[in-house]
Amino acid sequence: CRDLAKRHVDEPDVPAAPDGADGYAEWVQIALILYRVELEKSLRETEDYLNEMRGILAVFDLDEAPHYSSFCRWENEYRMRELRRLLRRSAEQAGWSGEAAIDASGFQRDQTSYHYRDRANYSFQSMKTTILIDVNSLAIKDAHFTTQKAWDGHIGMQVFRRNAEDLRVLSADANYSWSDLREECRSNSTRPLIKHREQTPLQKAHNARMNEDYNQRWMSETGFSQLKEDDGEKLRSRSWHGQFRELTRKCIIHNLTQAAS
């Protein structure tokens, strides 16, 4: 976490707490909110744990842990744009080959945001998460989140356009079968391994021809299973935007784990 955070910020050599107990360097803030994901502890538990583990505090160049309210404030301050940059950087650290699969799964929401539910006029207990994952390294390059019903083809197009320059192959099941998405891939020199809906003999033949190369797509399911280990399927943030950020932080920690393995 610390090394990724230092590579991400503009001033990595700033002392961890340049202003004493009231201020912390940007790299420390990023590193600690990511480390809390790895710990899987509450805000108060994280503060207590760090104060008991002086060796870990020393890794972050700290004498004592920040107050638990600081963790909460930092997690709310770092927006999705910043977290996406961290996610892409962590994917590169884990090893990005350009051969990727796209897939979706649901994460259970422990606490529903009633305000958002009323605004959206939609009742939900799970958050649909779509990830772009390297089939060789299991590095997650991008993630898309929604609490509403959305067609996979449209989501796939958004994810592809954000990452087109880093993709050589894109694998997806028939839920993403859309001629526009295939053409978008080809126009960006990306090979689309997207299953057809088997409504005609020709579509069945197309699917049969790509089976050998397509079979690595199951690695996306492995990525989801790793994200959901140790009760990781449940989200604890109260707001929908907080849950988007929470899941993105989980993906970053997943990448760092893959890089270290």
Predicted segments — roles?
Residues C1-E38:
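Basic, short loop/linker segments at the boundary and entry of helix-turn-helix/winged-helix-like folds
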Residues A17-W27, E38, D48, F71-N188, ...:
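Polybasic low-complexity intrinsically disordered regions
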Residues L39-E45, D231-L235, L256-S261:
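Short helix-capping/linker segments at secondary-structure and domain boundaries
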Residues S42, H67-S70:
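Short coil turns linking two alpha-helices in DNA-binding domains
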Residues R44-F60:
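DNA-recognition alpha helix
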Residues L62-P66:
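A short alpha->loop->secondary-structure connector
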Residues V169, A174-H241:
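Helix-centered, glycine/charged polyanion-binding patches within enzymatic domains
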Residues R238-S261:
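Charge-patterned, long linear interaction tracts outside catalytic cores
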